[in-house]
């Protein structure tokens, strides 16, 4: 079964673990998500819940969006995503908060990477440059397209748009859950720029060996007591 929530990347900071190690963490603000729809095998062919995140002004939403949100007694949402095989029983209109996770859980984080525009083969693909000596005529170009056939083979690594791709980082540790401020602290970096949307779900690699990470001065039970 899967747990999931939508959030917004705030930025990065540092915290100390109980062992005294200083680690980098990413702060994710995940205000309460609203369950817009509950899907099941009988009606939709699969089990899932549809989550809505961040209110959208009514003037910017169309009638179908307004009608869909009204069934859950809420306003239209800017972001709508699905979580398949969600853990627990849900009804339309329920809220999912950060306390669905706890410190020590491992999650998969999906986001849109930073866009870098049109870039050459060296920056985008890490290819080697040519000689920089005078008269070389070959410095930062992609190189030969092939000496025989009069076309470019599919899959040829060439300059082009860099970044702005959907990427998932697996097995990211949750270092701390701040229920009062709707924050999750995730170990390390995650895809995307600040303020970008992140989808956080339970990790799919449940059998992987995960080292335990605990934030100094905060016990696992402290988060539950705050809630």
UniProtKB/Swiss-Prot annotation:
GO terms for cellular component: cytosolic large ribosomal subunit. InterPro entries: Ribosomal_uL3, Ribosomal_uL3_bac/org-type, Transl_B-barrel_sf. Keywords: Ribonucleoprotein, Ribosomal protein, RNA-binding, rRNA-binding. It comes from the Bacteria. The keyword Metal-binding does not apply. One of its GO terms (biological process) is translation. SUPFAM superfamilies: Translation proteins (SSF50447). One of its GO terms (molecular function) is structural constituent of ribosome. One of the primary rRNA binding proteins, it binds directly near the 3'-end of the 23S rRNA, where it nucleates assembly of the 50S subunit. Part of the 50S ribosomal subunit. Forms a cluster with proteins L14 and L19. NCBIfam families: L3_bact. Belongs to the universal ribosomal protein uL3 family. This is Large ribosomal subunit protein uL3. The lineage of its organism: Bacteria, Bacillati, Bacillota, Bacilli, Lactobacillales.
């Amino acid at each position: 079964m899967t747990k999931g929530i939508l959030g917004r990347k705030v930025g990065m900071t540092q915290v100390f673990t109980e062992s005294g190690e200083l680690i980098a963490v990413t702060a994710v603000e995940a205000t309460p998500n609203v369950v817009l729809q509950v899907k099941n095998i009988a009606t939709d062919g699969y089990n899932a819940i549809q989550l809505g995140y961040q209110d959208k002004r009514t003037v910017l939403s169309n009638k179908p969006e307004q009608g869909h949100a009204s069934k859950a007694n809420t306003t239209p949402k800017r972001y709508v995503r699905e979580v398949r095989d969600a853990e627990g029983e849900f009804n339309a209109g329920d809220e999912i908060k950060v306390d669905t996770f706890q410190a020590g859980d491992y999650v998969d984080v999906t986001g849109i990477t930073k866009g870098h525009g049109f870039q050459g083969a060296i920056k985008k693909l890490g290819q080697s440059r040519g000689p920089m000596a005078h008269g070389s005529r070959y410095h930062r170009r992609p190189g030969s397209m092939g000496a025989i056939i009069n076309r470019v083979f599919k899959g040829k690594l060439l300059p082009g748009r860099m970044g702005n791709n959907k990427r998932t980082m697996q097995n990211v540790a949750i270092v701390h859950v701040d229920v009062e401020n709707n924050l999750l602290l995730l170990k390390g970096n995650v895809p995307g720029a600040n303020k970008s949307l992140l989808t956080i779900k339970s990790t799919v690699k449940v059998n992987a060996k995960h080292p335990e990470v605990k934030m100094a001065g905060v016990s696992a039970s402290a988060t539950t007591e705050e809630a």
